[in-house]
């Protein structure tokens, strides 16, 4: 059985070639193009030649008047040619950088400048050989499937034939693309062409789609920037009038796209300058973080701090290294909030500050809420045992309220509770580490000395009524101490009227010499001998504390091992 192919009608039909060119153009641009090709591939010329292909029938599966199915062996070596036109990238470095990740490639300035060159390629001298499965039907058209790669060779002619490496590169790339074309795209192209020839419904549908596409594409394109703004300026920022705007066109040298609004340009320039200089008058923009802050409160809010500038901190701090030495009375200061009994040690400028008793001062940065109770205290039964906790304290900050919740002492009803206020005229003395030793190791000795001094006070009589103010005595010792003030005769009168409460009166000694309490001008007169006796007793205690300086810097637990008596809180 032999077949005779009439190849001449295919060469004469012009519409067939036009349709085939469109299908080939769509097929060549559908697949991923190599990076060297930077434009669409357009088929400008197509010619199937005058030599038909050679077909050898290997198998016929179905044969009828309107259908056919068979397997052929095809060989072609004819004069068909194909001409393509596109644009290529002539700079290989630009192509290399585009195909590599940005973090792994260098950043040349001028070497990677793109250079596109138009390219025309002609494909000829096709040599095909392969097995083809051919299925024909008048209702479904022709289906051609290649079982193997039919392309053996072809000739590629281009405008770069004089450059050997460019010619070889194009030859290799085009062959790779044509192999994909024959295996994937060519069967679809042949099937669509056969439907156009033998199926009228398909032809009518394609014509309708073509008319719709042409109707949508009619009319010139509208340029959104064709209408100039209300206050246009040229590229140099000079304002233009209406006559100059009318003389301009899209085809002139001065484009209308450059006519921007002068008002908007000024706003953009001001915004750019303010952002560059971090000005505080930067226009507010939504979802923008500014590096310049208008006030410190903005920084506090931005940093997420919970500290509010409207709520003052209750703890008072002092910048001096050592504050005033004092004898605070636990009966005149009441704390509304008990502190933790766990000893927390704070390092001062001269050594380890242990505070008063076992309850040391908390960390300086910790905010404390202190409340001074100005109400009259209530009488309690255990008042005589509480005043033993009065001690000599040294701290690196201002005098604070007692470090533990204490009961209230029994005092006169006409004697108000005075809050601890720091006087301005008192002497600020440096902190002495030895005094912390005495505040822990010798509480019993302080109680005995206080009892002896108050008993001597009760035996003495006032010698004169002319002295109405406190007498301050200087100590011959080098150790500094606080000023001693004379309170009124209320303590003496209280000792005479209530002999049963002599123990309670004896424990009010720190209240009489507390420097925070103002002098009472209407009180009695303290004898000069009493003041000298008190000053001598204080000087003797200071000298005793000074002799124990060798053990002041020792470990904290060694100090407890050397205690002569238990602390005030556990002495009874």
Curated annotation (Swiss-Prot):
| Listed GO CC annotations | ERMES complex
What keywords does the record list, in alphabetical order? Lipid transport, Lipid-binding, Membrane, Mitochondrion, Mitochondrion outer membrane, Transmembrane, Transmembrane beta strand, Transport
What topology does the record note for this protein and the membrane?
A: Multi-pass membrane protein
Q: Which GO terms describe its molecular function?
A: lipid binding
* UniProt feature, compositional bias: Polar residues: 387-400, 500-511
The places in or outside the cell where this protein is found are:
Mitochondrion outer membrane
Q: What is this protein called?
A: Mitochondrial distribution and morphology protein 34
Q: How does it assemble?
A: Component of the ER-mitochondria encounter structure (ERMES) or MDM complex, composed of mmm1, mdm10, mdm12 and mdm34.
Q: Domain comment, in the record's words?
A: Lacks alpha-helical transmembrane segments, suggesting that it resides in the membrane via beta-sheet conformations similar to those predicted for other outer membrane proteins and porin.
Question: SMP-LTD domain spans which residues?
Answer: 1-195
Q: Name one GO biological process term.
A: mitochondrion-endoplasmic reticulum membrane tethering
Q: Which ranges are annotated Basic residues under compositional bias?
A: 358-370
Which family does the UniProt entry place this protein in?
A: Belongs to the MDM34 family.
Compositional bias per record (Basic and acidic residues), positions renumbered to this chain: 371-381
List the residue ranges of the region (Disordered). Answer: 212-236, 321-426, 477-522, 553-572
Biased composition, class Low complexity, residue ranges: 330-348
Give the function comment from the record: Component of the ERMES/MDM complex, which serves as a molecular tether to connect the endoplasmic reticulum (ER) and mitochondria. Components of this complex are involved in the control of mitochondrial shape and protein biogenesis, and function in nonvesicular lipid trafficking between the ER and mitochondria. Mdm34 is required for the interaction of the ER-resident membrane protein mmm1 and the outer mitochondrial membrane-resident beta-barrel protein mdm10.
Under PANTHER family, the record lists:
MITOCHONDRIAL DISTRIBUTION AND MORPHOLOGY PROTEIN 34
Is Membrane among the key words of this record? yes
Give me the gene this protein comes from: mdm34
Say which domain of life the source belongs to. Answer: Eukaryota
